[in-house]
Swiss-Prot record:
Compartment list: Cell membrane
Single GO MF annotation: transmembrane transporter activity
Keyword Plastid annotated: no
GO cellular component terms attached to this protein's record: ATP-binding cassette (ABC) transporter complex; plasma membrane
Name of this protein: Probable glutamine ABC transporter permease protein GlnP
Protein's membrane topology: Multi-pass membrane protein
SUPFAM superfamilies in UniProt: MetI-like
Species whose genome carries this gene: Bacillus subtilis (strain 168)
GO annotation terms (biological process): amino acid transport
InterPro entries, per database record: AA_ABC_transptr_permease_3TM, ArtM/GltK/GlnP/TcyL/YhdX-like, MetI-like, MetI-like_sf
CDD domains, A to Z: TM_PBP2 (cd06261)
Primary role: Part of the ABC transporter complex GlnHMPQ involved in glutamine transport. Probably responsible for the translocation of the substrate across the membrane.
């Protein structure tokens, strides 16, 4: 194990660049997947004729596919039908598709957890279905959904490492390149240990934030 060689200024800067790409891809994917997941989950909860059924089929299909397969599809299959995405866009698209399906189910379950008595009381007081959904059900449901949503975001951050298969210059990709510069593999343990600590620092911070939010709600 060569810690000194592995942790050279050049290597650390290169690894940090990969970490920034990981955070960027995760951040954009989180925003997009929450947006689409919220729409899909709400429409499934509202049971809009035909549309809800179509979304349910799409969500269940995506949830039962490996994320790696979706990454391959967005990067290698879409160009066959004239849609060519560069590496970062393909990674974000794949993560957004997969995580949107996961989040939509969390959101739908969260909305269903609200007591029907509150909904009936709101409707009897003169509120429309839409008003009841957005002003009574949604605010309460979102508070309950924070812990599982944060957990899903943590999974998303870790899942960015799968984009190494399409050569996204993220943390694991750059760690592999650094490791390849040692003829005897002496960089492997030091460099991947540091990569693991980087993932742990971010994910553990998110976990602590989720726990604190959960405690405040109880």
């Amino acid at each position: 194990m060569d810690f000194i060689g592995a942790y050279s200024q050049e290597h650390l800067a290169f690894l940090w660049d990969g970490f920034l790409v990981t955070l960027y891809v995760a951040f954009i994917s989180i925003i997009l997947s929450f947006f689409f997941g919220l729409i899909a989950g709400t429409l499934r909860y509202a049971k809009v004729p035909v549309l809800s059924q179509l979304i349910a089929v799409l969500v269940e299909t995506i949830r039962n596919l490996p994320l790696l397969l979706i990454i391959f599809f967005t990067f290698f299959a879409l160009p066959e039908i004239g849609i060519k995405l560069e590496i970062t866009a393909a990674a974000i698209t794949a993560l957004t598709i997969f995580e949107s399906a996961m989040l939509s189910e969390i959101i739908r379950s969260g909305l269903k957890s609200i007591d029907k008595g509150q909904i009936e009381a709101a409707r009897s007081s003169g509120l429309s279905y839409t008003q009841t959904l957005f002003f009574i059900v949604m605010p309460q449901a979102l508070r309950r959904m924070v812990p599982p949503i944060v957990s899903q975001f943590i999974s998303l951050l870790k899942d960015t490492s799968l984009a190494v298969v399409i050569a996204l210059p993220e943390l694991i990709h750059n760690a592999q390149i650094i490791n390849g510069q040692s003829a005897d593999g002496s960089y492997f343990f030091p460099i991947f240990l540091l990569a693991a600590l980087m993932y742990f620092a971010v994910n553990y911070s998110l976990s602590l934030a989720a726990r604190r939010l959960e405690v405040r709600q109880t």
